[in-house]
């Protein structure tokens, strides 16, 4: 049986919200090491929405290097003037399976 962690976050040089680990970076290599130690075969990356669009690219990079280990439910600014093109072309990005939004932000 394959074991998949359905929600992990990757970030780089960022301050995360209190619910997350309070470390400046949690990288693809950190995730792979912990996954191997826990017997997890693959993971779905959910880029933290509070960190903006650039964090999606961190996830895409992980998928490019380990397509057998990672896939992504990404996010974007719903107020973006380019939102229709973003949605239209979303799945062309490596590993993007769909979207995940949280609606608990003050905006």
What do the predicted segments below correspond to?
Residues 1-54, 88:
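An N-terminally biased module of ancient metal coordination in phosphate/nucleic-acid-related enzymes
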Residues 53-107:
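Active-site gating/metal-coordination segments in enzymes
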């Amino acid at each position: 049986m394959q074991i998949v962690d359905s929600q992990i976050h990757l970030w780089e040089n960022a301050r995360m919200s209190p619910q997350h680990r309070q470390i400046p970076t949690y990288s693809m290599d950190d995730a792979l090491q912990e996954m191997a130690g826990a017997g997890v075969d693959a993971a779905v990356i959910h880029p933290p929405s509070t960190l903006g669009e650039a964090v999606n690219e961190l996830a895409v990079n992980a998928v490019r290097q380990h397509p057998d280990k990672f896939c992504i439910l990404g996010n974007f600014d719903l107020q973006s003037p380019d939102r229709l093109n973003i949605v239209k072309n979303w799945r062309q990005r490596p590993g993007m399976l769909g979207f995940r939004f949280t609606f608990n932000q003050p905006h």
